[in-house]
Amino acid sequence: MEDFVRQCFNPMIVELAEKAMKEYGEDPKIETNKFAAICTHLEVCFMYSDFHFIDERSESIIVESGDPNALLKHRFEIIEGRDRTMAWTVVNSICNTTGVEKPKFIPDLYDYKENRFIEIGVTRREVHTYYLEKANKIKSEKTHIHIFSFTGEEMATKADYTLDEESRARIKTRLFTIRQEMASRGLWDSFRQSERGEETIEEKFEITGTMRRLADQSLPPNFSSLENFRAYVDGFEPNGCIEGKLSQMSKEVNARIEPFLKTTPRPLRLPDGPPCSQRSKFLLMDALKLSIEDPSHEGEGIPLYDAIKCMKTFFGWKEPNIVKPHEKGINPNYLLAWKQVLAELQDIENEEKIPKTKNMKKTGQLKWALGENMAPEKVDFEDCKDVSDLRQYDSDEPESRSLASWIQSEFNKACELTDSSWIELDEIGEDVAPIEHIASMRRNYFTAEVSHCRATEYIMKGVYINTALLNASCAAMDDFQLIPMISKCRTKEGRRKTNLYGFIIKGRSHLRNDTDVVNFVSMEFSLTDPRLEPHKWEKYCVLEIGDMLLRTAVGQVSRPMFLYVRTNGTSKIKMKWGMEMRRCLLQSLQQIESMIEAESSVKEKDMTKEFFENKSETWPIGESPKGVEEGSIGKVCRTLLAKSVFNSLYASPQLEGFSAESRKLLLIAQALRDNLEPGTFDLGGLYEAIEECLINDPWVLLNASWFNSFLAHALK
């Protein structure tokens, strides 16, 4: 069919049809019947207008080949075939110069002799059916409708056919020829059956009974009835000037609508100040694991037993010393806390039977690190409501921080593949319905792309730590319990592996409300030297605790092993969300699924297999200062997952605000990209709302810098 269209129609018509389809996101190579229909419709519109002129005396005449110098004006203005913006411009200018009522839909032609817009229809069905659909859709007495069919029938408003017999016969003959040409190539049947009805047929919908009473009760002020309100809404010209409309609606509103052009948006202003620091609850790219493969020791699966077994795999322990102190803390206490952990683990081993949990002795260093007895005493409100100068503490404004490069590196690392698999393919029952089959297939493909991703490791690590901490907080409220930070995975060969990242010591945890805080001290292994990016580790005290032998291409090298220690805190509600981090997998799967659905609806078949198996195709991943970054479908899956995981790891009020407010600016910029001529008012206020969220959070600052890259490239 596509070849036929390109042979049968004038190249200019073919090009216009391709442009029109692209504007609506349709592909002429796939929707070939639609392609043919658009070309046919364009050709009929051009033939309708051909040879018809208006002379100096404003009489309508037909000139097939005459004096090219005669002062003739085309009788018909052709609107069909122009892009939407241009088409509306032409329609508006005709309405302004002639005073004709503005149509609700873009018509095909304007007749300067009869002073009316014309809607041309070409149908493969009954002309009457099609005429009614058109009339129903445009609902305007003023627009003249003229329908042609491929069988030589026609129908027009009030049987007024506008053109002379001969001109109409030319059109009918051409349509009949197209039909015969299609039939001879075996294309006609498919073409005839593919015609759908007009897309926007609105029915008169009556509301009665309770719904009607509710509708009348919920009208805006100053409207007596639903009809009265409907009439007002229908008469509300969307393309009129909005300022006037706003003042019609309310006396208090005065907004100047400014057009949003490519030059309008400025980049977001990122804060100055010292570089931002790491604030996640556990180390990400800098974490180091002590691991055991194929664990089969006694008590395997009991965290404390697993932790001791992992600790025993390492032989390079040495006398710890502080290499990067915490600016504000009492650093010797952090050092003593680590020594206490080592000593108490040693004590456990000397016991006959290893206990399932370990509560640490309440030493001075731990009391200090866990803020024991530091919280002001809570007093019942009844006892102090008469105090005259009762007031809340003054709190300092947060200090601004600038974007540091480490957070982009963290994100890049989260998108990478590790050499272990972090999630198992869940056993789900047999598929029953076809839709379940597609769903399973998508889930399996997606799982294959993300199961080895570092972001998936972070999910499992987060789920484990939060579950263990919430359990201990409820089960051992008064104890300083030692909680190993553990994860489990499978190696490439399918062997099970248990990993120890370090330890947490929990403080007192009488958590009555969701937001009550439990303090904890985290101690995590790492090979990263904190002196390389000291700003990243502002909240940590870092010790050097051993030397690790690493296998490299040149043989074994010894690297210092560090312990990152800090005081931290969390709450029941944060732990609850942390335990549910697996949701990130679902969220990113749904985003991928909507991409597959978009592909499938264009091709009119399920594209899951092609989508994941066509390795040559690249997809947009995100914006960077270099432009739009592209990558394989696997990379897209992992990037979406990493974004979702970081939204969870770095959740904060700043992120909530930035996401909600920047989305508005994003939508405006996308509308401009799609040539929808957006208008805005109080753009300055929107910028203010976005920028008040850019304070010191590393993930928010990184998102803001990505947003600036998007603005720069999207509006070039």
Swiss-Prot record:
GO cellular component terms given for this protein: host cell cytoplasm; host cell nucleus
UniProt superkingdom: Viruses
Binding-site residues, Mn(2+) 2: 80, 108
Keywords assigned by UniProt, alphabetized: Cap snatching, Endonuclease, Eukaryotic host gene expression shutoff by virus, Eukaryotic host transcription shutoff by virus, Host cytoplasm, Host gene expression shutoff by virus, Host nucleus, Host-virus interaction, Hydrolase, Inhibition of host RNA polymerase II by virus, Manganese, Metal-binding, Nuclease, Phosphoprotein
Post-translational modification: Phosphorylated on serines and threonines by host kinases, including human casein kinase II.
Placement of sequence motif Nuclear localization signal 2 (NLS2): 184-247
InterPro entries cross-referenced by the UniProt entry: INFV_PA, PA/PA-X, PA/PA-X_sf
Gene3D superfamilies: Influenza RNA-dependent RNA polymerase subunit PA, endonuclease domain
Required cofactor(s): Mn(2+)
EC class: hydrolase
Cofactor note: Binds 2 manganese ions per subunit.
A Pfam family recorded for this sequence: Flu_PA
Gene Ontology molecular function: any one: RNA binding
Subcellular localization, as worded in the UniProt entry: Host cytoplasm; Host nucleus
EC number: 3.1.-.-
An example Gene Ontology biological process: viral RNA genome replication
Ranges spanned by the short sequence motif Nuclear localization signal 1 (NLS1), renumbered to the chain: 124-139
Function: Plays an essential role in viral RNA transcription and replication by forming the heterotrimeric polymerase complex together with PB1 and PB2 subunits. The complex transcribes viral mRNAs by using a unique mechanism called cap-snatching. It consists in the hijacking and cleavage of host capped pre-mRNAs. These short capped RNAs are then used as primers for viral mRNAs. The PB2 subunit is responsible for the binding of the 5' cap of cellular pre-mRNAs which are subsequently cleaved after 10-13 nucleotides by the PA subunit that carries the endonuclease activity.
Protein name: Polymerase acidic protein
Source organism of the structure: Influenza A virus (strain A/Chicken/Hong Kong/YU22/2002 H5N1 genotype Z)
